[in-house]
Amino acid sequence: MGKIRKLDDQLSNLIAAGEVVERPASVVKELVENSIDANSTSIEIHLEEAGLSKIRIIDNGDGIAEEDCIVAFERHATSKIKDENDLFRIRTLGFRGEALPSIASVSELELITSTGDAPGTHLIIKGGDIIKQEKTASRKGTDITVQNLFFNTPARLKYMKTIHTELGNITDIVYRIAMSHPEVSLKLFHNEKKLLHTSGNGDVRQVLASIYSIQVAKKLVPIEAESLDFTIKGYVTLPEVTRASRNYMSTIVNGRYVRNFVLMKAIQQGYHTLLPVGRYPIGFLSIEMDPMLVDVNVHPAKLEVRFSKEQELLKLIEETLQAAFKKIQLIPDAGVTTKKKEKDESVQEQFQFEHAKPKEPSMPDIVLPTGMDAKQEEPQAVKQPPQLWQPPKQEWQPPQSLIREEQSWQPSTKPIIEEPIQEEKSWDSNEEDFELEELEEEVREIKEIEMNGNDLPPLYPIGQMHGTYIFAQNDKGLYMIDQHAAQERINYEYFRDKVGRVAQEVQELLVPYRIDLSLTEFLRVEEQLEELKKVGLFLEQFGHQSFIVRSHPTWFPKGQETEIIDEMMEQVVKLKKVDIKKLREEAAIMMSCKASIKANQYLTNDQIFALLEELRTTTNPYTCPHGRPILVHHSTYELEKMFKRVM
């Protein structure tokens, strides 16, 4: 007898469940997507013990006909595709026909459904076996309950996280679905406590306000663009509103939430030099395209996709975001930095707390600013500030964060309900309706961000603090300018232009500069000699593992030539493949930082005026190349409120 045999359906479903049903969040995702495919306009999600004990999904969709109920729980049975051509033109969220049989094989499942024009169907399945099937009275739609998930696969239960973690995974996926389909009203409950309620009025900004807070919604920039193949719509936050994780960016393709690293990267590139290192925006981007241009049949979870015109799409996203930011004055209000964390900090990691300790600023050596002596000799910088009273220094102490003890999940021992599900109490209370109406009103009252160009407003200097910050004013209030960041931006745009030119003047070194490398480093640099010439670095081989540099571009900062050469060589060695665009960018950023005014350097009035005038000529006068803000605004109203002149 042969060794190879065909597996029975029950074992096949258990194996398939390993890919489709990883955790309770997978069950919620698949069932809610089925409800959306069934044209539901209202969906309720009820959880007990983060879904490990019970998941109940109630919708008002098309329902399932009696003759289809049994077939729906067979593998690869679906109403969404019929032939091979449909597989390449998928418009629905589900299509594989694996979710329902996989879920039923590892749980105790109860289904009540009706199409509205015939009696409903009541079905009970335990571990893939049909226990009960009968007709029942039911409204149009589907009511499906999944209990005791993984009851027959105890090994899977061992790998489940705590209730808090599993609930965080569920809320994350529900939030993404809510953003993907603002036309559907979603309600999420855990142990009878409401976690989310969206109105279903189609306003995605209202959904974002429900998830991330009304304060974040006020800082959203609308994004819209169209090409021959793609249509992009969405919202992204101003650069002043950032988070420490990429999880706050959501990408939707043809109504389906997807995880795609290159799309995330394109959004980040749209914020080029506007975000600090390690900070990410909150964003929602919906992309519509011909289904032929995207392959969603990559993984059973359907979270990964492939694009056939990927580079064209990425370019469109980058250019659209950059064009939007060029229309806005990106000056953060001082209030943004002093507010406590908004509720959205806990959206993706609901039960984890981010601890941050302030870093002390470094104080590099003092150098005079560049670019200020074009027409006249630079006045001597003031080395000592006026003798003013200074308050005693106090060390900042972060508040003690609340830490909850996580509890392990214990599976419920309740038997499956053999009777039809009773109608639960109505959650549409007057109080809940009022809260939703109040949110709708707040969102309607949000003023659109002005897109009148990003020119720096007129600023009139009035002083300097600690040799680091310049104070200026105009009719809109007080501005504080970081002098180092300001000149860093000026120098960056100057060097970026210079590094980008292949034909450039060079200056001979009096003594050739020798660079000794390890064999691995030498071979890597040798491969990139032509690329290095494009950024003005001309190397000659000198011995077995050395190079010499005889000249350098004239725009290298004086006295820092060898240091810059070493830095550029280090970048080449560090990168496995040299991206000439990135290399030029890094070189410009490095030189701009080294050539800029340092902290604790007091400037004369002439120097301050010259600095602000040069800043005005830059294409982006609002952030340094590292993404830190150059200036912060205190409105006149805020100042009056601080001094109780207004209440």
Curated annotation (Swiss-Prot):
GO biological process, any: mismatch repair
Region (Disordered), start-end ranges: 375-395
Key words of the record: DNA damage, DNA repair
Molecular function via GO: ATP binding; ATP hydrolysis activity; ATP-dependent DNA damage sensor activity; mismatched DNA binding
GO cellular component entries: mismatch repair complex
SUPFAM superfamilies (alphabetical): ATPase domain of HSP90 chaperone/DNA topoisomerase II/histidine kinase, DNA mismatch repair protein MutL, Ribosomal protein S5 domain 2-like
Domain of life of the source: Bacteria
Transmembrane segments: none
Family the entry assigns: Belongs to the DNA mismatch repair MutL/HexB family.
Purpose: This protein is involved in the repair of mismatches in DNA. It is required for dam-dependent methyl-directed DNA mismatch repair. May act as a 'molecular matchmaker', a protein that promotes the formation of a stable complex between two or more DNA-binding proteins in an ATP-dependent manner without itself being part of a final effector complex.
NCBIfam families: mutl, PRK00095.1-3
Protein name: DNA mismatch repair protein MutL
